[in-house]
Amino acid sequence: MPARAHTPTYHFSKARRLLDSSEYQAVFAAPDRRISHRYYLLLARLNDGPEARLGLVVARKNIRMASDRNRVKRVVRETFRHRAGSLPRMDVLFLPRRGMDGLAPARQTRLLREAWAELDRAFQGEC
């Protein structure tokens, strides 16, 4: 039987999530990088773990409808999931701003792909 080529896994397992408030607080308290955009804020901090991890902070104040909040979170998770293997070991917090829910999902996806690429460039050479 031929050996299988290694294919990347695109799961969004618990190991790729920030799970408790102390993990969120560590990033809020001392982010290594801030990427600010009209529609979102990314805070990132290098971690000692094996891979990049994501935390979402989606306030009802910024996105009123629950369905819109869920859609934004789904797009963020999906784009992160596809890019996580190539990102440096870091903890990332994603905070959407007002107006993010008004964008089409395709535009949200494009913005987030650009954000992950910018974050990757920001940490180049530090990991």
Outline where the language-model segments fall.
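Positively charged, solvent-exposed patches that mediate nucleic-acid binding
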Residues: 1-127
